[in-house]
């Protein structure tokens, strides 16, 4: 596994409705030399109903999202936060990266470590 000195760990929460994926939260933490140095976290406004499963899994409610910024604003802020830094995530290659790509952000070259894959390989 590549050793990263300065990187972004990120996670997305999303809701599926009528075949479309809707972001509901974008979170990221910047680490340098193993220390958290900055963080970004935003809910995302949506008018689509939240599935009860998503509410139970995340604790996010429609009330939480009603005054949140629009997805375009959140995506821009996230892009500014990440910059060109390497990224790590948990199973993000299968879910989070494709969702970001739907919003015009291609982080496939910056995505360096998938912690799900690392954990699976170490158990084998």
Range-by-range predicted roles:
Residues 2-105, 109:
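Conserved non-catalytic scaffold segment of RNase H-like nuclease domains
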Residues 112-124:
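Short alpha-helix plus adjacent loop in nuclease-associated cores
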């Amino acid at each position: 596994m590549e050793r990263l000195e300065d990187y972004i760990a990120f996670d997305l929460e999303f809701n599926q409705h009528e075949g479309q994926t809707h972001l509901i939260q974008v979170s990221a933490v910047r680490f340098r030399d193993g220390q958290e140095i900055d963080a970004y976290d935003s809910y995302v406004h949506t008018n689509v109903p939240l599935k009860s499963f998503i509410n139970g899994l995340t604790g996010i409610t429609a009330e939480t999202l009603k005054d949140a910024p629009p997805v375009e604003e959140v995506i821009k802020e996230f892009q500014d936060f990440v910059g060109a830094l390497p990224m790590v995530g948990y199973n993000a290659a299968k879910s989070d990266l494709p969702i970001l790509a739907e919003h015009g952000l291609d982080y496939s070259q910056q995505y360096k470590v998938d912690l799900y894959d690392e954990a699976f390989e170490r158990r084998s």
